[in-house]
């Protein structure tokens, strides 16, 4: 997320505003994992904030992943201030890999790092995050892509891939090595989604190609690529929305419902804002206990457009496209556990 830290204030939001729902969890860019009977939620914030829950509704604050920013972060992003963006949590072979982004606002002076733990339970004696450093870095003037908003997934053969990107030349997919902490060699890159970037846009500017936050979700022989279009983090003026395409292979092409390649500007709308909720986006998607869910943030009109967590059950139409019920935005309300 390019601008989350400009409006990110308190992760725990309580408001006395008329009609507002109090004591909900306020997050940007939420991702989840389940260990045992407990869910863990990670989000953009100082040091990466996280919560735990047993029911996906009531959440207990668990502090921060990083007490101090990664030691290498200011070398990659000299203006880094400890505010870590867009985490992704991934489990493999008994380890949890937490990918995250450091960046300079409005520039592609960015990098994606990863830290590893054997447990998500902060009360376990085995709990210890061990940072592995940067996985990939973008440099202004060299790269026409932005190394933020990572998601990692294994394909059907067990090969790990990282999708990422924001604005510039769109969303990328790159193969990871067997250790899941570095790019595989020889490197293999794909552009999986983009929007039109006008010619002669300076390379060091994000430009108006408003797309970011890829998330690939496998289902029934398809890979579904979710992405966020338009603008986050502008309160009532936020225009974020979630779009999707799908492919039979993880490298694409990802086609929307009309057969348009997302790498050529395609994308089928999944959910957008309404009068009660603005700026829906930066979603993740999971299957928990046989049900599919979309997890995202949204800004609540009745609470001065503060960011709130949304966990929405996701269905599928007869043609195999994801379906959400807009009314669930009001039905789902997280609760902060004291």
Can you say where each PLM-predicted feature lies in the sequence?
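Carbohydrate-active catalytic/glycan-binding domains of CAZyme proteins
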Residues: 19-338
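N-terminal signal peptide c-region/cleavage motif recognized by signal peptidases
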Residues: 14-18
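Bacterial N-terminal signal peptides that target proteins for export
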Residues: 1-7
């Amino acid at each position: 997320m390019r601008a989350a830290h400009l409006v990110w204030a308190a992760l725990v939001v309580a408001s006395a505003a008329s009609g507002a729902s109090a004591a909900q969890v306020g997050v940007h860019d939420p991702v989840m994992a389940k260990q045992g009977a407990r869910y863990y939620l990670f989000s953009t914030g100082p040091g990466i904030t996280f919560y735990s829950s047993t029911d996906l509704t009531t959440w207990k604050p668990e502090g921060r992943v990083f007490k101090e920013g990664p030691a290498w972060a200011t070398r990659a992003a000299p203006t880094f201030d400890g505010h870590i963006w867009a985490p992704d949590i991934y489990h493999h072979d008994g380890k949890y890999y937490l990918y995250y982004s450091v960046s300079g606002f409005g520039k592609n002076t960015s990098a994606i790092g990863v830290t590893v733990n054997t447990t998500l339970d902060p009360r376990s004696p085995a709990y210890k995050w061990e940072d592995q450093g940067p996985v990939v870095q973008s440099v202004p003037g060299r790269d026409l892509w932005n190394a933020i908003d990572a998601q990692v997934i294994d394909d059907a053969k067990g090969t790990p891939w990282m999708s990422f990107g924001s604005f510039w030349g769109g969303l990328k997919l790159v193969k990871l090595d067997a250790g899941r902490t570095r790019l595989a060699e020889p490197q293999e890159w794909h552009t999986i989604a983009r929007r039109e970037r006008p010619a002669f846009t300076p390379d060091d500017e994000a430009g108006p190609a408003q797309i970011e936050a890829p998330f690939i979700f496998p289902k029934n022989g398809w890979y579904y690529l979710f992405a966020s279009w338009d603008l986050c983090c502008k309160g009532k003026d936020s225009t974020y929305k979630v779009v999707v395409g799908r492919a039979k292979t993880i490298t694409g092409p990802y086609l929307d419902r009309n057969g348009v390649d997302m790498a050529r500007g395609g994308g089928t709308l999944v959910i957008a804002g309404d009068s009660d909720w603005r700026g829906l986006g930066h979603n993740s998607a999971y299957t928990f206990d046989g049900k599919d869910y979309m997890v995202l943030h949204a800004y609540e009109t009745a609470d001065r457009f503060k960011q709130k967590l949304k966990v929405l059950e996701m269905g599928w139409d007869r043609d195999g496209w994801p379906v959400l019920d807009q009314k669930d935005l009001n039905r789902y309300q997280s609760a902060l556990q004291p």
